[in-house]
Amino acid sequence: MAQAKINAKANEGRFCRSSSMADRSSRLLESLDQLELRVEALREAATAVEQEKEILLEMIHSIQNSQDMRQISDGEREELNLTANRLMGRTLTVEVSVETIRNPQQQESLKHATRIIDEVVNKFLDDLGNAKSHLMSLYSACSSEVPHGPVDQKFQSIVIGCALEDQKKIKRRLETLLRNIENSDKAIKLLEHSKGAGSKTLQQNAESRFN
């Protein structure tokens, strides 16, 4: 009888310890789950800051190279450029880096995709029209929407092999490049229009002198 009581107490002790360990494990797992959510929120916030930095730099650069900037006095342009350079310098002081975890295959896919985009960018000066068409086909390969033009199937398969975060960055880079080309086209057209209007005015003035 005494031995049975001793065994019962021993079993009770083991049950208490086991129950206590399970509770601790559950609490620790719950804490880690909550921390995982905060880690992902931190990465998302840092990525948002990265994107905001890119957008700000692009906007400052766009203002500096705008047609409006060319149509003001030298003194005003110099003053505005000083302000723009100051803002650009302050923006560049913000350093945010979100590293993407990649396996070897994803790393190789990213290098391949980056190399293809760089090759197109290097052709800008030689043939802007062709480069723009090529970029649009690359962008269509990254878009989940129904493409409005041709899709570079080879590039699409390469991008699919990249990490999800890298896929988003590739798409953003292509969007930025296409916007820059669009802005350049507009600036050239405005410049040609202003030159054409100026030539027409000069011609009219010359004709009026002879009449």
UniProtKB/Swiss-Prot annotation:
Example of a GO biological process term: protein metabolic process
GO molecular function, one term: heat shock protein binding
Residues with PTM Phosphoserine: S20, S31, S73
Residue ranges of coiled coil: 20-61
Top-rank lineage group of the source organism: Eukaryota
Residue ranges constituting the BAG domain according to the UniProt record: 109-189
Keyword Transport attached: no
Keywords of the record: Acetylation, Chaperone, Coiled coil, Phosphoprotein
Function: Co-chaperone for HSP70 and HSC70 chaperone proteins. Acts as a nucleotide-exchange factor (NEF) promoting the release of ADP from the HSP70 and HSC70 proteins thereby triggering client/substrate protein release.
Protein name per UniProt: BAG family molecular chaperone regulator 2
Upper lineage: Eukaryota, Metazoa, Chordata, Craniata, Vertebrata
